[in-house]
């Protein structure tokens, strides 16, 4: 609602909630962009029917868009239930990954310039797969931290305030808070939020160590300048992400 009488009617119908035009505008922009993305994926699916490859991936993309639309709806109707919010987040990452895979799949028909062999990187494949798993786990922990409004609990580095270990509870961190009317601003007690935040910081330390090792080894063993630059770009993104993560605690 944008008019005063409509806002008053909405406020009277839902007295426990407060109308926030700024949040409503952001939500509508998100919905319009999501709808545009859905139309683009539908067009990709239609065009892929006439292509020799990429049909299965395009069909999976369309199915994932439908699932994402449902998760987006449940995010609202279930009042920001954390498990739905995290699933919606992972759906977005999966969409991006599948679009990149589709681009790679459709680009196989084009002739590629000869590239130098990379025997030095073959042994790094297990470490690369480990980095992918660790990164996905850290993204999940970050989404769980945000969905449960646990980001502002710990203010000291490297893990939390003194005495956190005595109150840490793994069961509380991964408990599913069900049956609440709304999950906005979080419903978990301090111990659970603190445990979630500590796990996220531990995950950040592990992810930083694994990714930094992979970047340094790729820079050292890669034969092509292109791959060395790509490794440097990943390292720069890692430094940026760590900086953004520790900045709130440093500023405070």
State each model region's role:
Residues 1-252:
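Polytopic transmembrane helical bundles with strong interfacial aromatic enrichment
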């Amino acid at each position: 609602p944008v008019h005063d009488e409509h806002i008053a009617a909405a406020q009277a119908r839902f007295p426990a909630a407060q109308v926030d035009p700024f949040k409503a505008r952001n939500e509508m922009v998100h919905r319009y962009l999501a709808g545009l993305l859905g139309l683009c994926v539908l067009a990709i699916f239609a065009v892929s029917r006439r292509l020799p490859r990429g049909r299965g991936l395009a069909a999976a993309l369309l199915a994932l868009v439908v699932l994402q639309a449902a998760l987006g709806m449940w995010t609202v109707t279930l009042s920001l239930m954390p498990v739905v919010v995290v699933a919606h987040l992972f759906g977005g990452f999966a969409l991006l990954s599948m679009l990149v895979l589709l681009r790679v799949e459709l680009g196989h028909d084009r002739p590629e310039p000869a590239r130098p062999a990379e025997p030095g990187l073959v042994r790094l494949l297990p470490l690369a797969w480990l980095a992918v798993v660790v990164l996905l786990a850290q993204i999940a922990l970050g989404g769980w931290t945000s969905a449960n409004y646990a980001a502002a609990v710990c203010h000291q580095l490297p893990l939390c305030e003194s005495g956190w270990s005595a109150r840490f509870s793994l069961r509380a961190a991964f408990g599913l808070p069900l049956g609440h009317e709304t999950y906005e601003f979080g419903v978990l007690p301090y111990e659970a939020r603190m445990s979630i935040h500590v796990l996220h910081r531990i995950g950040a330390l592990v992810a930083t160590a694994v990714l930094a090792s992979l970047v340094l080894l790729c820079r050292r063993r890669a034969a092509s300048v292109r791959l060395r630059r790509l490794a440097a770009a990943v390292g720069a993104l890692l430094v940026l992400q760590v900086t953004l993560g520790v900045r709130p605690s440093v500023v405070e």
